[in-house]
């Protein structure tokens, strides 16, 4: 006897609200912060999110009879209050692993943050966290090389690495750009960097920039004996152009290239990560456009999710905020996504906004890059917050030194070494940072003038995207 079905519309919660469900190790788990339209029950909205991000649609369809809907559907299994906000709640949803293409972060994000984010029954929705099951993690390529391989490749141990974004970011000729790179590397930096919007403009075509930067690297290395690099931005208008730039960087001997992973796209990023893995190039990732996606505390995608996504898609470095600089960043949240980038296993920790355990297995970690409005006075806090496996990247805080780029670079290295030594001696470097730098400044007029130049520069604005009250 043929099966029949009841045509029409029924409430989502009849099918997708399952508070008795116990998530499996193989499930994807997602936590959404949801603000429903007035009068819509929480259970109905949570179920609607589960449906619209998995198997459901607005009406019953006869083709449901052709599959095992109970197996493939997403399940809203828990609801929690958001303390301090009566209008919002957390919806926890489990998805079977078979809903997603292996190794495709694009597949995951298309489902979880696709049409459901435009659903009329929602005033706003934000993806706060995802638990990627280990079985899925193992299908992803991840970072091309990882932290230890980079340490060995660059021969840098026992301290954070130092970088600098060349300024002004736009307008320099390739020759003058290369000159700035040389001065910074000669002064003691480990890396210099293209800014996110440096690609191939009329005033500086990419091939010219690559050549002048590589000349600067080789000249500085000959003088100092130190291995250094410049993040050559391979981001381009098409994947074909991106690969051409990466290939040229490899041919001229560059150790590292760069990609804007959000504006460039996840497909392009994963492809470039695979290329870098096969060809021995490190991959630096800029997060341009993240503020559009993650800064609104009620709508979008939290940066901790973007950090997981990038680690799985592939990158050896990722800009991660600074806490102390000019860019948005809550300390607890920052510490949470720094752990997500580097550690093999991250336990649920609501004090850092981490909603699920996350196991990355043997996947290498990503080096967090502190960049944006930082200068020498921030060095003690940066070393304390980020630790050794990081890049501390001073753009204006290097090139803005009154005595020039090379001196600015040398000053940052002096300050870094002073802070690392003090930390290794057991000092509380955040608490004693001013004293540590002032004492070193007595023996370094270059450091002293830098401290004088930036002593009044602070970025003390309230954080827009704070951890929810219950997490503190």
Curated annotation (Swiss-Prot):
EC primary class: lyase
Binding residues annotated for substrate, in chain numbering: 115, 165, 169, 287, 319, 371
EC number, as in UniProt: 4.1.1.39
Induction: Both mRNA and protein accumulate at 2% and 0.03% CO(2), but not at 15% or 0.15% CO(2) (at protein level).
Disulfide bond sites: none
Subunit structure: Heterohexadecamer of 8 large chains and 8 small chains.
The protein's name in its UniProt record: Ribulose bisphosphate carboxylase large chain 1
Organism: Hydrogenovibrio marinus
């Amino acid at each position: 006897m043929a099966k029949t079905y009841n045509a029409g519309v029924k409430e989502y919660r009849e099918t997708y609200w399952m508070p008795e469900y116990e998530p499996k190790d193989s499930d994807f788990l997602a936590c959404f912060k949801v603000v429903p339209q007035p009068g819509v029950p929480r259970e109905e909205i949570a179920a609607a999110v589960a449906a619209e991000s998995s198997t459901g649609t607005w009406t019953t369809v006869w083709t449901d009879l052709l599959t095992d809907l109970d197996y493939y559907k997403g399940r809203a299994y828990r609801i929690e209050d958001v303390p301090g906000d009566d209008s919002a709640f957390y919806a926890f949803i489990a998805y079977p692993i078979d809903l997603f293409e292996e190794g495709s972060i694009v597949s995951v994000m298309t489902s979880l943050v696709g049409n459901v984010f435009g659903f009329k029954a929602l005033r706003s929705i934000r993806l706060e966290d995802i638990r990627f099951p280990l079985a899925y993690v193992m299908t992803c390529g991840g970072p091309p090389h990882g932290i230890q391989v980079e340490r060995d490749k660059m021969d840098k141990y026992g301290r954070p690495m130092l970088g600098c974004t060349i300024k002004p970011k736009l307008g320099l000729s390739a020759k003058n750009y290369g000159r700035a790179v040389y001065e910074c590397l000669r002064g003691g930096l480990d890396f210099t960097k293209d800014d996110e919007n440096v690609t191939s403009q009329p005033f500086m075509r990419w091939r010219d920039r690559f050549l002048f930067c590589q000349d600067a690297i080789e000249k500085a290395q000959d003088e100092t004996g130190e291995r250094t690099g410049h993040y050559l931005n391979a981001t381009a208008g098409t994947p074909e152009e991106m690969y051409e730039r990466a290939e040229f960087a490899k041919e001229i001997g560059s150790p590292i290239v760069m990609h804007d992973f959000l504006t460039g796209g996840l497909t392009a990023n994963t492809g470039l990560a695979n290329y870098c893995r096969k060809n021995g190039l490190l991959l630096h990732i800029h997060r341009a456009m993240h503020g559009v996606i993650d800064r609104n505390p009620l709508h979008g995608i939290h940066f901790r999710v973007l950090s997981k996504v990038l680690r799985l898609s592939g990158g050896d470095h990722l800009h991660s905020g600074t806490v102390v600089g000019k860019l948005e960043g809550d300390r607890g949240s920052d510490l949470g996504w720094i752990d997500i980038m580097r550690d093999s296993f991250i336990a649920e920790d609501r004090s850092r906004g981490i909603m699920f355990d996350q196991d990355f297995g043997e996947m290498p970690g990503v080096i967090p890059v502190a960049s944006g409005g930082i200068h020498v006075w921030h060095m003690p806090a940066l070393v304390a917050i980020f630790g050794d496996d990081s890049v501390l990247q001073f753009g204006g805080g290097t090139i803005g030194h009154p005595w020039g780029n090379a001196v600015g670079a040398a000053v940052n290295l002096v300050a870094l070494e002073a802070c690392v030594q003090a930390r290794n001696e057991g000092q509380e470097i955040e608490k004693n940072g001013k004293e540590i730098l002032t004492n070193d400044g007595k023996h370094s007029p270059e450091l002293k003038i830098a401290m004088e130049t930036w002593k009044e520069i602070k970025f003390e604005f309230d954080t827009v995207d704070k951890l929810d009250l219950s997490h503190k």
